[in-house]
């Protein structure tokens, strides 16, 4: 007998707008939290024990918020809005105030990427005012580090990912562009290391596994493209995954490197084994495009969750493949 189709263990309602981005914070303190940000400029901080919004933070002048994250420094939230601002929030002791902001000048949908370089210090990468440029600054000082502009015409920057390699200097940055290209940048040298043409359409999203030096990207078409870095930091295209329906908003790899989730324009979340890209499950609940997916960072593997946020203004939470299942 085939397994019954999975259902959400619960859903969160009341966000009041399309759910563009999700971020878990479950490893510190007693209360596991999920941050969601909407197209109406609201950030909901959901208490996963009570399954209710503990707090609602309004920002970015009501403009759509496209990215949220937390910094290691306690109670510091960072958000990016379509008002061309990145805001740093102090959420300690019941506060919800913007303590600093960065003007990006970008009107696109490219989400920022943040990398902790030392305790209390981060690098922040974001799409700049010019179509193809990526700017990187240090936080909290806001000192400019570099501006990365490709030599060839690749169109608008669509998605970026900062990461720190285990060996050699760093950090490095992966970027997907409007013409379907992926570029790997050396931030320190401000130079392009390699490129690959991963898609015929714009790269809508990418995610990267620094331990395995392997990544995957999606676009508006029916194909996910997987790729890897060799020892010389050359991008090498690997297998493609053909989807039933076109369009992927976001991709996410679980922290243990076993699962990959995709947010589909067809209202579905698809789950694959990350090792061999074996299809494992199709999660059907939402009534509109799924815009975001995130795996929780619980320390206990049995508590791990997958969250999906949709244009239908709901967040679904799922518990899947937590007990050593063969994910392939």
Segments and roles (model prediction):
Residues 291-328:
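Blade-level signature of beta-propeller repeat domains, shared across WD40, Kelch, NHL, RCC1
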Residues 22-31, 68-74, 113-121, 160-170, ...:
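Loop/turn segments within WD40 beta-propeller blades
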């Amino acid at each position: 007998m085939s397994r019954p189709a999975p259902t959400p263990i619960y859903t969160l309602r009341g966000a009041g707008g399309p759910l563009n981005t999700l971020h878990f914070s479950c490893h510190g303190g007693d209360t596991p939290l999920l941050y969601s940000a909407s197209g109406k400029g609201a950030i909901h901080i959901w208490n996963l024990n009570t399954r209710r919004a503990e707090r609602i933070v309004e920002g970015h002048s009501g403009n759509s918020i496209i990215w949220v994250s937390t910094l290691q420094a306690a109670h510091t939230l960072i958000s990016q809005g379509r008002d061309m601002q990145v805001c740093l929030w102090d959420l300690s002791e019941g506060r919800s105030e913007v303590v600093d902001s960065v003007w990006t000048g970008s009107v696109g949908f490219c989400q920022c990427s943040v990398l902790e370089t030392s305790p209390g210090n981060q690098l922040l990468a974001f799409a700049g005012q010019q179509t193809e440029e990526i700017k990187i600054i240090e936080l909290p000082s806001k000192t400019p580090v570099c501006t990365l502009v490709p030599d060839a015409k690749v169109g608008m920057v669509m998605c970026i990912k900062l990461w720190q390699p285990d060996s050699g200097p760093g950090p490095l940055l992966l970027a997907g562009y409007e013409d379907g290209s992926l570029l790997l940048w050396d931030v320190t040298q401000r130079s392009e290391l390699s490129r690959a043409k991963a898609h015929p359409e714009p790269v809508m999203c990418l995610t990267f596994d620094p331990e395995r030096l392997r990544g995957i990207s999606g676009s508006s078409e029916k194909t996910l493209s997987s790729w890897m870095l060799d020892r010389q930091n050359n991008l090498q295209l690997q297998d493609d995954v053909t989807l039933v329906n076109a369009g992927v908003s976001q991709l996410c790899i679980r922290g243990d490197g076993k699962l990959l989730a995709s947010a589909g324009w067809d209202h579905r979340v698809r789950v694959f084994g990350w090792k061999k890209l074996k299809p494992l499950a199709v999660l059907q609940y939402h009534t509109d495009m799924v815009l975001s997916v995130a795996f929780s960072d619980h320390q206990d593997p049995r508590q791990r969750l997958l969250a999906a946020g949709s244009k239908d203004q709901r967040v679904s939470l799922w518990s899947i493949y937590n007990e050593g299942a063969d994910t392939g």
